[in-house]
């Protein structure tokens, strides 16, 4: 699994670097500081896991679909509009990853803060979340990335993402962002 992750990350970095000017660490620091998301509290993480029917143990680990104890990851995803910054909760594969998820990162759950709690607005298993530059109802469109030449496309319907056809690899554009990174 580690080799597949390294290979995928290397390919993504190589593709992302094509045709872009190199930046120095000094260039990157102000961007990181300005765009750094607020740290999530332990209570927020627990609330997100409970929103997807998972109960963390004392160390924060959960049981994935393969019955492996794993540590979830939490990533801020900017979607704009009424959603704003959502949270992507990744329940990764463990020792059984290839039999459950193939080369994918695991179970992905996209959550939106609704007051003091969180609600799931999209989920997928074994693929990647692709955030597109296009938007509907003021919120960025998303696609389920993975093998193949076209992928399920989702538009914001005001409360969650609903499937709206497919999108070809070539139509995603260079500005599409893939998660987890």
What are the residue ranges of the model-derived segments?
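Acidic/hydrophobic-patterned starts of short beta strands in beta-sheet-rich repeat architectures
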Residues: 81-95, 135-145
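A short beta-strand motif characteristic of beta-propeller blades
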Residues: 64, 117-122
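Beta-propeller blade signature
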Residues: 106-113
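Short consensus segments that form the blades of beta-propeller domains
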Residues: 96-103
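Signature of short aromatic-glycine-proline-rich micro-motifs recurring in repeat-based ectodomains
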Residues: 66-76
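C-terminal motif of bacterial Sec signal peptides marking the signal peptidase cleavage site
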Residues: 15-17
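Acidic, small-residue rich beta-repeat scaffolds with periodic aromatic anchors
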Residues: 19-51, 56-60, 65, 131-181
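Bacterial N-terminal signal peptides that target proteins for export
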Residues: 1-8
């Amino acid at each position: 699994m580690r080799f597949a992750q390294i290979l995928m990350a290397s390919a993504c970095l190589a593709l992302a670097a094509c045709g872009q000017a190199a930046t120095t660490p000094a260039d990157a620091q102000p961007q990181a500081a300005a765009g750094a998301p607020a740290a999530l509290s332990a209570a927020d993480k627990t609330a997100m896991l409970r929103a997807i029917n998972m109960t963390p143990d004392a160390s924060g680990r959960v049981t994935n679909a393969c019955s492996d104890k794993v540590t979830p990851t939490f990533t801020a995803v900017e979607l704009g509009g009424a959603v704003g910054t959502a949270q992507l909760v990744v329940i990764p594969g463990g020792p059984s990853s290839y039999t459950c998820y193939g080369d994918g990162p695991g179970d992905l759950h996209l959550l939106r803060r609704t007051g003091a709690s969180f609600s799931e607005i999209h989920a997928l298993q074994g693929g990647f979340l692709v955030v597109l530059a296009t938007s509907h109802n003021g919120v960025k469109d998303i696609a389920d990335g993975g093998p193949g030449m076209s992928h399920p496309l989702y538009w914001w319907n005001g409360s969650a993402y609903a499937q709206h056809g497919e999108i070809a690899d070539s139509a995603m554009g260079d500005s599409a962002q893939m998660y987890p990174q």
